[in-house]
């Protein structure tokens, strides 16, 4: 996967955004409860700098390295 961005999820690959693992956390208190959303992005795969070009090729990063 060194030549492709694993975070591409869009019709126009030049406008790809990061897609990571999302999970929810429910915090319960004696008086109230609320839901928080957290997102974990695989920075170890692309250093958080991965840009997708047309065809979903990786530009300006070390995806998968």
Curated annotation (Swiss-Prot):
Give the Gene Ontology MF terms in alphabetical order.
Answer: copper ion binding; zinc ion binding
Q: Does the keyword Nuclease apply?
A: no
GO biological process terms on file: intracellular copper ion homeostasis
Q: In which tissues is it expressed?
A: Expressed in leaves and rachis.
Endoplasmic reticulum as a keyword of this entry, yes or no, is no
Q: Keyword annotations for this protein?
A: Metal-binding, Metal-thiolate cluster
Cited InterPro entries: MT3
Top-level lineage group: Eukaryota
Q: Which family does it belong to?
A: Belongs to the metallothionein superfamily. Type 15 family.
What is its biological role? Metallothioneins have a high content of cysteine residues that bind various heavy metals.
What protein am I looking at? Metallothionein-like protein 3B
């Amino acid at each position: 996967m060194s030549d492709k961005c694993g975070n591409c999820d869009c019709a126009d690959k030049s406008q790809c955004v990061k897609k990571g693992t999302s999970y929810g956390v429910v915090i319960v208190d004696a008086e109230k409860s609320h839901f928080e959303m957290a997102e974990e992005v695989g920075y170890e795969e692309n250093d958080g700098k991965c840009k997708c070009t047309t065809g979903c090729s990786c530009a300006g990063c070390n995806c998968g390295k």
